[in-house]
Amino acid sequence: MSQHLVPEAKNGLSKFKNEVAAEMGVPFSDYNGDLSSKQCGSVGGEMVKRMVEQYEKGI
């Protein structure tokens, strides 16, 4: 099981993941065993892209 650097961020990241997945049309749920690696990776990649953009706006 992975350890979160900031445990308090877990719920926020889950909500963010679900929002991004919904926008992309990827049906995320508590069980995602039926999703392809490509689908999961595209959601994660989009999350990172948006987080980097937000960070750069704050610089």
Swiss-Prot record:
One of its GO terms (molecular function) is double-stranded DNA binding. The keyword Protein transport does not apply. The keyword Lyase does not apply. Keywords: DNA-binding, Sporulation. Pfam families: SASP (PF00269). InterPro entries: SASP_alpha/beta-type (IPR001448), SASP_alpha/beta-type_CS (IPR018126), SASP_DNA-binding (IPR050847), SASP_sf_alpha/beta (IPR038300). The record marks E19, V20 as: Cleavage. SASP are degraded in the first minutes of spore germination and provide amino acids for both new protein synthesis and metabolism. Signal peptide: none annotated. GO terms for biological process: DNA topological change; sporulation resulting in formation of a cellular spore. It comes from the Bacteria. SASP are bound to spore DNA. They are double-stranded DNA-binding proteins that cause DNA to change to an a-like conformation. They protect the DNA backbone from chemical and enzymatic cleavage and are thus involved in dormant spore's high resistance to UV light. Belongs to the alpha/beta-type SASP family. This is Small, acid-soluble spore protein C1. It comes from Clostridium perfringens (strain 13 / Type A). The gene is sspC1.
